[in-house]
Amino acid sequence: CALAADYAARGHEVTLIKTSHSLHDDNFSHLCATGGRMRIHEFGTDTACVIAHLSRDVADVRGKDIVLLCTQTGYHPDVLRRVVPFLTPGQILLMIPGYLSTAYALGLHLADGVILAEAESNFIDGRIGAPGEFQVGFRNVRNPIGVYPHNALPAAREVLDRLGTPFVYLKSVAEAALHNPNMIVHTVGAVMSIPRIEATHGDFCMYHEAFTPSTWNLLEVLDGEKMRVLEHLGCDPVP
């Protein structure tokens, strides 16, 4: 919802498609009731946004220049099975974050000429404070993405740069997937916090509690292993 509202505020015609009735369904219902109106609160600045179109029909991805897939990565296979049949040559499917879900899309008989792109991480971090109200935590000033096939990069770049997001284009979607920091941060933080999570019955905030010096040491070692994998793949091991 936040990305849809943000791009709408930048002047893009946006269609927000909700593919389930689970997370943030109350916010989507609010948007439907108010004509797509949402406010973004960002460090003392309030921006009123109007999302042009709201839908629960995945067929509405047809004809869109860019299709952004923003659902949780665990649901990528299911959502892609529903979306891919409606994609046509020239469209760009941008998965945020990607986590190498390009592999799922390619296994679904994707139409020739559809361009796939994977973002390393979300462009905007924040929380929905109330229906129709989004509080920005931070914006990434550098947003790495990979494009598949690689020879489609010039055409994809021409379209994606119109969004106004500060993109950095990587060598491959694999590089974008491996560079996602959550692969390391969430794994170490969650595993090392299991006793604390159980003791508090889930009343726990990983970013505030998990990363003691010993846990951070483990994170650094595992991240170093990942960097060596990136080097062997011919990618840039950006820390």
What are these language model-derived features?
Residues 177-239:
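C-terminal substrate-binding/catalytic lobe of Rossmann-fold NAD(P)-dependent dehydrogenases
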Residues 68-69, 73-134:
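Rossmann-like NAD(P)(H) cofactor-binding subdomain of soluble oxidoreductases
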Residues 131-151:
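Short beta-strand and adjoining strand-loop segment in the mid-core
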Residues 14-17, 114, 167:
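Hydrophobic anchor at the start of a short beta-strand
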